[in-house]
């Protein structure tokens, strides 16, 4: 169902002036929100400033959202990627999936990833495009292959990663990867790789390259 | 499945900033604090010439340390003879002689006995063997003579 369909449906239900306000009719005092297909959670990985900090100390959920309006409210209130300190990560994951390989929902999956050496303003725009494609589900397949999306801020580079729930559905993964390249505005000369989580950390080997 | 295109999502973006369900100010404060710590660390890193306080390793000498030796003074006279002049050494000799005189100053010396054989039956010194030797053997005739003199 598209946003226009949702809006039309709301308008058809409304019979008088007391109809619920949407973000389209009143951007600050709307009553009805546009639901997303899933609940999503924003996670943040804080860079370690003390050697005693472990990975579990650094990775924390920030907030969750289930509607388009909630999503925009969060985006307007958190720092943009170019404002983040080095070694920070933003993660947006579906439902209650933790952005870790060990999570049962991720254990049999993998990730499409691409490193970008680009201006910070471009990173902000590309991260927003990736988020919109993921929460709007336009990048995903009908059977929902995507678990989440990650942005890693590093010195001189930024890494975008799209996490999937499976690593063996080549056709679906290829479709997702092709759309991911479009979202990141990559050309034919830019190559993205799919790496199953099972091979990460040992001998990293991409199973699909686009 | 509900889908929203990128354009549709942008269309639904509120013009005003809306309240959120978490403490955004605290979140921003944490990020700012981390940035400050990172900036301080980088400043310290640069101040130390691109390395942190590494202790100087014992392997930093790639060869023998340089020791500066003064060159000996050689003078060549009109006949072409070169003479080695150890001018500094003369001064050193004087210093050494002074040192020697200082060393001669009498001191109370503690003599440490050699206790190596102190519990042994063997004498510690060969001289002791001579000293312990019985020098007067018993003369029986002489003893008889002396008895007779006493009786008379």
UniProtKB/Swiss-Prot annotation, chain B:
Family that this chain belongs to: Belongs to the CAF20 family.
Biased composition regions of type Basic residues, renumbered to the chain: 51-72
Molecular function (Gene Ontology), one example: translation initiation factor activity
This protein's record includes keyword Endoplasmic reticulum: no
Subcellular location per the Swiss-Prot or TrEMBL entry: Cytoplasm
Function: Acts as an inhibitor of cap-dependent translation. Competes with eIF4G1 and EAP1 for binding to eIF4E and interferes with the formation of the eIF4F complex, inhibiting translation and stabilizing mRNA.
Main location: cytoplasm
Name listed for the protein in its UniProt record: Cap-associated protein CAF20
Gene: CAF20
Biased segments, Polar residues type: 114-123
Keywords annotated in UniProt: Cytoplasm, Initiation factor, Phosphoprotein, Protein biosynthesis, Protein synthesis inhibitor, Translation regulation
Biased segments, Basic and acidic residues type: 124-133
Listed InterPro entries: Caf20 (IPR031456)
A Gene Ontology biological process term: negative regulation of translation
Region span, Disordered: 46-133
């Amino acid at each position: 169902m598209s946003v226009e369909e949702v809006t039309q449906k709301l308008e058809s239900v409304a019979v008088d002036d007391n109809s619920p306000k949407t973000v389209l009719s009143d951007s600050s005092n709307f009553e009805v929100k546009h639901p997303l297909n899933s609940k999503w959670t924003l996670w943040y990985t804080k860079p370690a400033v003390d050697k005693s900090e472990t990975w579990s100390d650094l990775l924390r959920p920030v907030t969750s959202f289930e509607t388009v309006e909630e999503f925009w409210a969060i985006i307007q209130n958190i720092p943009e990627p170019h404002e983040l300190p080095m070694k920070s990560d933003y993660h947006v994951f579906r439902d209650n999936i933790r952005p870790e390989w060990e999570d049962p929902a991720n254990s049999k999956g993998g990730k499409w990833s691409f490193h970008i050496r680009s201006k910070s303003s471009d990173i902000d725009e590309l991260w927003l495009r990736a988020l919109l494609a993921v929460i709007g589900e336009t990048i995903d397949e009908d059977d929902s292959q995507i678990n989440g999306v990650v942005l890693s801020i590093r010195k001189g580079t930024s890494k975008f990663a799209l996490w999937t729930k499976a690593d063996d559905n080549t056709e679906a993964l290829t479709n997702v990867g092709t759309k991911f390249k479009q979202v990141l505005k990559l050309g034919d000369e830019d190559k993205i790789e799919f790496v199953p989580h099972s091979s990460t950390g040992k001998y990293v080997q991409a199973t699909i390259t686009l | 499945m509900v889908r929203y295109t990128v354009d549709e999502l942008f269309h639904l973006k509120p013009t005003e900033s809306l309240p959120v369900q978490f403490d955004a100010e605290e979140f921003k404060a944490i990020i700012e604090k981390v940035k400050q710590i990172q900036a301080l660390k980088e400043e310290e890193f640069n101040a130390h010439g691109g390395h942190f306080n590494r202790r100087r390793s014992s392997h930093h000498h790639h060869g023998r340390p340089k020791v500066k030796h003064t060159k000996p003074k050689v003078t060549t006279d009109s006949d072409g003879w070169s003479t080695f002049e150890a001018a500094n050494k003369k001064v050193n000799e004087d210093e050494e002689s002074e040192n020697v005189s200082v060393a001669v100053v009498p001191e109370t010396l503690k003599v440490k006995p050699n206790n190596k054989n102190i519990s042994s039956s063997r004498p510690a010194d060969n001289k002791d063997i001579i000293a312990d030797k019985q020098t007067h053997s018993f003369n029986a005739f002489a003893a008889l003579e002396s008895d007779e003199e006493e009786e008379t």
